[in-house]
Swiss-Prot record:
It catalyses: di-trans,octa-cis-undecaprenyl diphosphate + H2O = di-trans,octa-cis-undecaprenyl phosphate + phosphate + H(+). This is Undecaprenyl-diphosphatase. One of its GO terms (cellular component) is plasma membrane. It is found in: Cell inner membrane.
């Protein structure tokens, strides 16, 4: 993977990781279109790009990393358990699902889910407005919903946001809890890949790794801030439409 390809993947990861449009799906498609060989060294570079996205969440929500928020983080850990357990048990089977037809199909399915949900969803004052107010029951159900993200093209952010909306969270609170929930999920995935591809990091070009990391971090940091501002004025309908259109394009191109 050269520097240009790494920049492209860093931009894609930074934009799509925290939006409900599947970062994995976009990275699979981009890798195919850029003819990036799926060798162990390139997989290691993708891990570095994901780690940068984790740091972007920490940078945006650094005020949450205090002892007074320990209850919030216990709920985040609870929500992580379902996807962590199932992902660990079935990671080999899940890898076989990483195909363009599967990604395209799940893009469309996810888009339809968002359109249907937004048709019935109305913001109410009774909805949870701040992530600190989420109950353990709500956190668990959001975590269960996130399990669907193990299917490529579903979107981790999308699955967790849908679960949060169904559990009575506001759009803003749904997105913010999804951001925080990304930390253990991405850390676990990156940690697993680090263990399996550890030796490949020594073969990776440090310039390429650094450029990918910085690009992903900066884009992810800005995306999080813009996305929260967007949700204070708009709905998820545009994401539903995009998912259906992009999924149809993928299936058409084959």
């Amino acid at each position: 993977m050269d520097v240009f390809q790494t920049i492209i993947l860093g931009i894609i990861e930074g934009i799509t990781e925290f939006l409900p449009i599947s970062s994995t799906g976009h990275l699979i498609v981009a890798s195919n279109w850029l003819s990036i060989e799926q060798n162990e060294t390139n997989k290691a570079i993708e891990v570095i790009i994901q780690l940068a996205a984790i740091l972007a969440v920490i940078a945006n929500y650094r005020d949450k990393f205090t002892l007074k928020h320990k209850v919030l983080w216990s709920k985040v850990v609870l929500a992580f358990i379902p996807i962590g357990a199932i992902g660990l048990l079935f990671h080999k089977e899940i890898k076989t699902l990483f195909t363009v037809p599967m990604v395209g199909t799940m893009f469309i399915v996810g888009g339809i889910v968002f359109l249907v949900l937004e048709h019935f969803y109305q913001e109410r004052s009774s909805h949870v407005q701040e992530v600190e107010a989420i109950s353990y029951r709500q956190a668990l159900w959001i975590g269960i919903a996130q399990v669907f993200a193990l299917i490529p093209g579903t979107s981790r952010a999308g699955a967790s946001i849908v679960g949060a909306l169904l559990m009575g969270l506001s759009r803003k609170a749904s997105a913010e809890f999804s951001f925080l929930l990304a930390l253990p999920v991405l850390a676990a995935a990156a940690g697993f890949d680090l263990l399996t591809h550890y030796s490949d990091f020594s073969r990776g070009d440090m310039l390429t790794l650094s450029v990918g990391f910085i690009t992903s971090f900066l884009i992810a940091y800005l995306t999080i801030r813009v996305f929260i501002g967007f949700l204070q004025r708009f709905t998820f309908v545009s994401f539903g439409i995009y998912r259906i259109a992009f999924g149809a394009l993928l299936l058409w191109l084959g």
